[in-house]
């Protein structure tokens, strides 16, 4: 019964474990230990080292994972995941953040934190995770006219539900809560100080999280969440909070990028050449859309930037691609410089 409240489904219960083991869910990750809840208790567990010695870091448990627990409180294995969110660190290694969530809530505040390029980056990793993305715009009480932001969102996140909320008055939460499925697991993504902790408190109906805020002078956030942790709310939702991430590297799974930039991908299907770089080739549908204003330069440049970032991480993990990708991007960058110099000003 307890694990059902914490989101276990037949997908996980049908994965076989030893008769002497039990199912558990990781609710927090610390340096050397994992906080795990089972049907009977919540405790700090360690890894059975022999079982994880030769596995990659992505095979280690993360918040939200369902795991096999031994009688002596050791994690024996990680069950197959339904969804997973990871980011690339500075060494181009994949770093797990959380697993097995139904919704990825991208939280941005309606001040200087509102950034379309960052939103597209978050949407890319959200789609790539396998979860359903939802945009949460906090501090809506500070904005008189929301139509400006609605138009901005329509340009880069068409079809993704967006909710304008005020954590103080609770405005906007009723619509959001009616659309979330009961007993769902939610992960919150966003920069420091955008109101993620206050949002959790509003969703929970109690002061569950410590809050800080954004400095008024520069709109920079202050960290209140220092580690990844799961919270079971009294209304049945399970929330995974993460430390604020203003910048993070995307991985090299093309699916999330194709979904976020589906408009550009659809345009690219109309190009004359199947291997079009969308920078200099004749009869390029993407360049034509740039010329007639159908596609904005900002959206296009962010698409190219994320494409290149994914290619970089792919090269780091597959050295054989390095020379091929380097030569290709030399051509693209040269043609982009030529395009920007010769493009008539409007």
Listing of model-derived features with the role each one plays in the protein:
Residues 1-116:
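N-terminal accessory targeting/assembly segments
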Residues 56-66, 71-72, 80, 86-103, ...:
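Helix-rich effector regions associated with P-loop NTPase G domains
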Residues 106, 135-137:
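Structural beta-sheet core signal
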Residues 110-111, 139-140, 242-245:
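Conserved Walker B
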Residues 117-128:
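Histidine-anchored nucleotide/phosphate-binding helix
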Residues 132, 139-194:
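Canonical P-loop GTPase G-domain recognition
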Residues 196-212:
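A conserved segment at the C-terminal end of the G1
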